[in-house]
């Protein structure tokens, strides 16, 4: 029987074809004993596969699934992905045994996150470049030392690093407004960078600040009120002998109720 650009015995129980067309769907009916069809080497579209499955629901069909610019065996347990689109996600339903996908060479991060959301049981790997380093999807601690990095670059990278817990950027040159915006966007991440206060730099995870004996002006107090929000772990501020009146402290105490002002 002519099929797939060749001829095959009509008594065959299995067929392996390098070419398959819509016209071959009807020809399969001549193979009365056929139980398995391997067309992984053929350029078969999902629509053509559906035609085969609809006509022969009991037939075991092994084919190659087109995703992005690559094709993958339908019975693959693990695959190495090239870039793909969100619109390709329904094609992953055709895999019969897929358990792992390696997307470390992909840059289609929105599609990767969509794939992760659609198939949470899939072991999915990817990596995200940040500054001069790369981080796997399960990275918890991010260390940044490239001062030319922009807030938007870090923001973009963090969106694709769902396991990130801490970001360390000791020489961060950004404004306090830019830092505050990032903390607000990623409240579950602890940012560790330097905070400039009264001409001195302090780590943002400082727990206690002391300005005891240093004269504090109204302008200084205003700066203090603005900067304290940058300290993520602050517990105590020592203002003994600074000349600050109690009534001037009330707005600060109200703004930071968890901080002990002494």
Language model feature labels by segment:
Residues 1-262:
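N-terminal capping/linker segments that flank leucine-rich repeat
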